[in-house]
């Protein structure tokens, strides 16, 4: 087996390569529109046109009004704004209880923890073993003082897609605002805010081939979480700070392109994902898929290899030119087991050997086959040197022999 000459990038859930068309537009905005979009003269108007066009493109992609799109510095800021802004707004009505899931992105988890330190109460809904949040569990947790339900649309580690429409209906039945972190969903699957019925939705440009450091929060008309950043009158006085003109232009263009070709992109990524899952589960003993397959992002494969540490596999893959992940890139410096996998009941020792492979439109079947070739060589070789694996095999053999006597 020979190494591929190019890098095989299979970590598209962490970030995606910037689309050339988006980059070209960003360079044009940086080099040509030198004015402040709030200024009332020609070069300011040129900059504002980039902002207005980007806002319209983002709004169209999720079936919203441009006036409902508020640009942020990233998806994490959008999440913080939705959660903390709602909490501070509703606290004035003596509503200080929030509901989320136990396997959210850390932008939500840490925002909730921050609010708990301020005296708010948070209920964490446990997902099923396949990685889904049940609407009936959300409804059972709602109280008279509940301010917000925040459930992610698609999990960033295992890719499971949640029944957001049904959860939003439950929340609204009780007069509770509904937010969804759709950072992994927007640009990857169809997202229609009117169909979903959510009040707020977070997104991030670099997840759909746009620039890093650029996000947005959709707020349904009439929904105003308290500002987190005060200052100027930008973003309809809801998020101060001079707009990132080039970032907004690139975000709008990238999302427009992603949604224009969404069906074929989804089919392509699903083909690669299913090939890898089927082959690995068939050819590598005890490999297991984490999360259900039926409602799952088309490009996500999260697989555990018992008896090994994910970091070891990661290094081997890197030596073969393959970029993958042991979980969320936002928590990649930690050796603790994934809170996502623990929440769905994956044992800690198995969770440590989990790998996330996420495909994008630029990936090929040749790359998917190469990944499997490498894993089929690396996993048995590493297991042969793994005390954890050998001990487990000897224990299993011991009990098997006892059963034969």
Task: Put a short name on every predicted segment.
Residues 1-405:
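Pyridoxal 5′-phosphate
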């Amino acid at each position: 087996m020979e190494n591929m000459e190019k890098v095989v990038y299979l970590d598209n859930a962490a970030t995606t390569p910037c689309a050339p068309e988006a980059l070209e537009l960003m360079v044009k905005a940086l080099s040509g529109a030198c004015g402040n979009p709030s200024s009332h003269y020609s070069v300011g108007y040129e900059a504002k046109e980039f902002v207005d066009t980007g806002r319209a493109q983002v709004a169209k992609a999720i079936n919203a009004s441009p006036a409902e799109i508020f640009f942020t510095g990233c998806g994490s800021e959008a999440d913080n704004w939705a959660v903390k802004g709602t909490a501070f707004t509703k606290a004035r009505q003596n509503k200080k209880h929030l509901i989320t899931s136990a396997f959210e992105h850390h932008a939500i988890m840490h925002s909730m923890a921050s609010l708990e330190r301020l005296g708010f109460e948070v209920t964490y809904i446990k997902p099923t073993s396949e990685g889904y949040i049940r609407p009936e569990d959300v409804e059972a947790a709602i109280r008279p003082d509940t301010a917000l339900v925040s459930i992610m649309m698609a999990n960033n580690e295992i890719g499971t897609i949640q029944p957001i429409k049904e959860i939003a209906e439950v929340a609204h039945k009780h007069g509770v605002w509904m937010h969804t972190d759709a950072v992994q969903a927007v640009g990857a699957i169809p997202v229609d805010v009117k169909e979903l019925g959510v009040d707020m939705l977070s997104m991030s440009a670099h997840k759909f081939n746009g620039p890093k450091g650029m996000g947005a929060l959709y707020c349904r008309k009439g929904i105003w979480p308290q500002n987190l950043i005060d200052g100027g009158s930008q973003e309809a006085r809801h998020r101060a700070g001079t707009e990132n003109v080039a970032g907004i232009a690139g975000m709008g263009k990238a999302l427009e392109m992603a949604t224009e070709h969404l069906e074929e992109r989804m089919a392509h990524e699903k083909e690669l994902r299913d090939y890898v899952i089927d082959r690995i589960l068939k050819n590598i003993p005890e490999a297991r898929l984490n999360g259900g397959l039926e409602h799952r992002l088309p490009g996500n494969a999260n697989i555990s290899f018992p008896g090994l540490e994910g970091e070891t596999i990661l290094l081997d893959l890197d030596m073969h030119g393959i970029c993958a992940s042991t979980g969320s890139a936002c928590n990649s410096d930690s050796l603790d087991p994934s809170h996502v996998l623990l929440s769905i009941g994956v044992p800690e020792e198995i969770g440590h050997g989990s790998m996330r492979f996420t495909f994008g439109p630029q990936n090929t079947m040749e790359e998917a086959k190469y990944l499997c070739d490498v894993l089929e060589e690396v996993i048995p070789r590493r297991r042969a040197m793994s005390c954890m694996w050998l001990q487990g095999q000897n224990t299993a053999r011991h009990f098997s022999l006892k059963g034969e006597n």
